[in-house]
Amino acid sequence: DRSPSRGLGDVYKRQAGDSASYYEENGEFHFDVGTINIIVLTNVSLEPGTLANGLVTATEAKTVALNNLRIPSQFSNGFATGTGTDGIAIFSNMESKNRLSNAGKHSKLGELIAKCVIESISEAIKRQVWITKESQCSDLARLRRYDLDINEFYSNIGDDKEEFIKSLQEAARKQENVAVTTSILHLIDEVENDLLDKKVAYNLAASILENNCKDYCIQKLLEFWINKFLS
């Protein structure tokens, strides 16, 4: 119920035992992504077709904002392009003498719409779910979009789990490790989209890992991912 009569406190009332809104792991907070509502206000006169054109531009810009942060889909191994309940509205000033005929990507209006949407969504995501470019610069953040049971990995590492996880948390933030992880995940994506042969991708991923990753914990983690998706 999204009735205006309901106050903020009513919206957040819940019963003990209800599904959590977030979980915390080692100082990192993970939230379920909510609805993205976009309102675009212009001070020019736009015909219905131009308004529709602007809607398309704004929708594409929303996807750009999500992809820039590498936000994962909650239902597949791909990147999110939005949520299932997103809304968008665009308004024009019908009294304006400045009438524009295009709001697509080639037009200045389209450029401004897209830039505003990207900036506002990026800021909203930062404030609402604390996802930023800095928080996404992590091996663990990049790997999160793949539906694997991390407990299965931990149960088979054969090392001191506490020390291993401590080392992993530190090594996962190194940019060189994030670069290696991103390269290997790109190969996995290529295979999942039938753009690359699995054997070729496996050999390349193994070579990238062997020649570019020096942290034992990251090596073990990525070996697990490679074997799960490319072997």
Language-model segments: residues:
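C-terminal non-catalytic alpha-helical accessory regions
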Residues: F164, E170-L185, E192-L196
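Glycine-rich, often proline-containing surface loops adjacent to acidic residues and nearby aromatics
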Residues: V33-L41
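C-terminal non-catalytic accessory extensions
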Residues: D189-S231
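Single conserved hydrophobic/aromatic residue that forms the stacking wall/gate
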Residues: D1-Y12
